[in-house]
Amino acid sequence: MNKKSVKDIDVKGKVVFCRVDFNVPMKDGKVTDDTRIRAALPTIEYLTGQGAKVLLASHLGRPKGQVTEELRLTPVAKRLQELLGQEVKKADEAYGDNVKKQISDLKDGDVLVLENVRFYPGEEKNDPELSKAFADLADVYVNDAFGAAHRAHASTAGIAAYLPAVSGFLMQKELEVLGKAISNPDRPFTAIIGGAKVKDKIGVIESLLDKVDNLIIGGGLAYTFVKALGHEVGKSLLEEDKVDLAKSFMDRAKEKGVNFLIPTDVLVADDFSNDANTSIVPISEIPSDLEALDIGTETREKYADVIKNSKLVVWNGPMGVFEIDAFAKGTKAIAEALAEAKDTYSVIGGGDSAAAVEKFGLADQMSHISTGGGASLEFMEGKELPGVTALNDK
């Protein structure tokens, strides 16, 4: 991925339109998790340090193309000000004459947070008019929003047609780490694919079968594979229309010499709660009236063993319903195995896996936590990311 970065251009005295990913959780008008804001700090601090006038653009939530008061970026700007230790100004719109007036008052090194770009219907449609209106505000475009790189929107892709366009440090690191994992991995290379649905992970499983030494399956999608082996799955999540596909994946893994691991035992429950009665059974003995909601003890140990003997592990998707403690042990076992495997480079593919390592207090022991769930998945599938394609080549 040879794209220009902020270090390849001169930004002193220039107005920089920097697309960041400030789509953070909020409660009662306060930011409850500032991880994504912190992740953008190196780029913002570099730009201010170089004497740029920095405009920060982001989406927040899904306002559906109209102004939604509780989705304004004001609390985000406030939190950013605390983290940066300098005044952060806030605009009430994302473009237009009022914003231009605010920009003309900026000094070198100042920061102005623009309003939620998804307040405008043209953002998600990648409308050229809106892209141009954004571009008219600035001299340079920087994209540091890896989490939105798989979207062809006005502020992530369209704007790049009208300005010099480069990546920020976060975007650059994501592309380097994930790019190496896909094109030149250290071996043994293990991928762990969890989550609820096979249909969401078809592309990534297909792509990884050509690259990995071990492919570990967990989460709700595992039961379609269990069914493909000829076992009944009780009330567990099952995609009947994907059973043949699951079988073909296992056959293809065998042909390629890939070690394809699915659970050998599972935790079954009579209720979707912490008070449920649970027991651990082999996959051949899942009772018809119960639901499997996590991997079993034997499976946990087997998976941990594979992890410890790997040089590179990419993890995307939990092993069970980890939000409920009764069904979190499998996911926790994976996180702990990664934390303990000191010679293993661990890449956590955003989304639920990132939330899980946070929940278990193990985030700082992972080598790289991706800031983009959907984007990292599409990147690993080998798809082009519009937000990356739009940037200038070196």
UniProtKB/Swiss-Prot annotation:
Keywords: ATP-binding, Cytoplasm, Glycolysis, Kinase, Nucleotide-binding, Phosphoprotein, Transferase. ATP binds at residues 201, 323, 350-353. The keyword Ion transport does not apply. It catalyses: (2R)-3-phosphoglycerate + ATP = (2R)-3-phospho-glyceroyl phosphate + ADP. Its main location: cytoplasm. SUPFAM superfamilies: Phosphoglycerate kinase. It comes from the Bacteria. The modification Phosphoserine is found at residue 183. Substrate binds at residues 21-23, 36, 59-62, 118, 151. One of its GO terms (molecular function) is ADP binding. Its EC number is 2.7.2.3. GO terms for biological process: gluconeogenesis; glycolytic process. The modification Phosphothreonine is found at residue 299. Monomer. HAMAP family: Phosphoglyc_kinase. Belongs to the phosphoglycerate kinase family. This is Phosphoglycerate kinase. It comes from Bacillus pumilus (strain SAFR-032).
